[in-house]
Amino acid sequence: MNPKNKLAEMPVRPLLYTMAVPLMLSLLIQSLYNIVDSIFVARLSETALTAASLVYAIQFLMIAIGVGTAVGLNALLSRKLGQKKPEEACRAATTGLFLMLGTSLVFTLVGLLFSNQIAAALTNDPELQQLCREYLSVNLVFCWGIFLQTYGQRLLQAVGDTVLSMVSLIIGAVVNIILDPIMIFGLLGCPAMGIRGAAIATVIGQLIGAAAALWFNRVKNPVIHVRLKDYRFRWQDVADIYRVGLPTIVMQAIGSVMTFAVNGILLGVSSAAVAFFGIYYKLQNFLMMPVNGLGQAVIPVVGFNYGSEQSDRVKQAWEVLLPTGVVFALCGTAVFLLFPAQLLGLFSASDEMLAFGVPALRIISVTFLFAVITILCGYFASGLGNGVVNMIGAALRQLVVLLPCLWLLIRTMGIDRAWFAFWMSEVIACAYSLWATKKELRNKGK
């Protein structure tokens, strides 16, 4: 079936699921190699794992800009295709490529010029600073891979081809996972590079994944092509991309700020607490990847059918989305409730970390249902062209409510009960996101 016909005619439930499953698998694999990185780094030392956790806040900011730009581009391309304007879609895709390349250049310069200063801002400990600098500089200087890989995947997703999007990510992930132990520990004649080796393995995997995604677009994407000949830059395309993309960038960047701030709060408790939060965050991201895959799939479905004025299909997508997400949330909660010690054990957790980490994982897991609803509401609203719902929901759950509550509870009730701050933030964010998305659906689904 032609990609455009599939988005317009295929029954919504199977359409959403067939698009979502490859995305879920690709995101799970992407998250898995982040976890594999941490598992190998943890075998170096808990200090190395703490350094990787501190740097993750900066990596997350970089990913935020790339993903946000790609989400905005994806939504715009889907609407243009739904409006039967393929030439405008191709022009927007070319503009998106220039935006990604420009952003990559900025982060490369930051890595070359400011890695020492960033490491100093993350921690006062000299050993941690050195490890942070080694890990961060490689990821920043060679960031081209993650931006171009994200770009290529979103072009494929915009026409409904989530399978090739998944394959490109799998290629990069497999390369990364194979290279990790070789470069970290010095296997097969490669010098042992420690935490720097983990970073090098990551960027090589990203660059190869990017090459695969761009190649698939060149030979397999039947609709969207980058065209430099007769290309005319239009600020309106940039505005349309960032109307949805900027709130998503802010939303993702909020996660970076949250990670940085929580690490700062937890450093006052112990370095083990920082290492634990880094582990939790990656485990939670792994379990949430099916939800993000479902959310990414709904953007082109909603965007295309909203653009083609098929409001009944937009409403059907909403009716399928949340119940499916709830199932994933309950499964994730069950895993965290039943196997917290085993999950932490994957990362060579110390006795100190296990003492507060096991109850912490159980406390936080209860909030997954509310988090899933908030996340999916944000994706759905983005498909309708409104990225603000996503941004405000993220701000409430990760910044505005969470940080002051966590800071207060640590000082008044100690580390063991501080994790109840997640309950407060997730419930408030969920209530807002449901209200705002239903309002958007009423206004645009008429």
Give a label for each model feature:
Residues 28, 32-50, 119-126, 182-193, ...:
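Helix-terminus/linker motif at the lipid-water interface of multi-pass membrane proteins
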Residues 18, 41-60, 126-131, 195-196, ...:
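Interfacial/gating helices of multi-pass transporter permease domains
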Residues 13-32, 36, 58-65, 141, ...:
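Residue-level signal for short hydrophobic patches within transmembrane helices
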